[in-house]
């Protein structure tokens, strides 16, 4: 067992090194990729986080929260059209990712809310944070900061 464990740990370390390079993060059956946020005007009290989450396992898992250094609160939200009105609500306990499913957190859909900001994300300065899953646990991630109005990672062509 201990020999297997050390091989596993070595593999895990190698995978982690590769993942950091590719900006993919895994824990258990959960894979997180394309992690980003947008610049917000100075003085803004909220910012949003986006990412792609894949559940490679056989059971559902739930994105229940996380943290980012410059926000007092971190919530999982959903935006959707309801009778022609865009409504945003907090998901309790969180966002369920079904087995084999990939969920994209993006503007106008599911997203993370960073609330009560002490400082604003700045373009070109990646921000480290964590996301927490009910089963997979805590995953350390790094958010790439895109310009205001970006619709996706590396988009940067949003209209103002």
Regions found by a protein language model. Give the residues of each.
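Bacterial N-terminal signal peptides that target proteins for export
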Residues: 1-9
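Cleavable N-terminal signal peptides
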Residues: 9-10, 20
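Compact, glycine-rich, soluble single-domain proteins
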Residues: 23-160
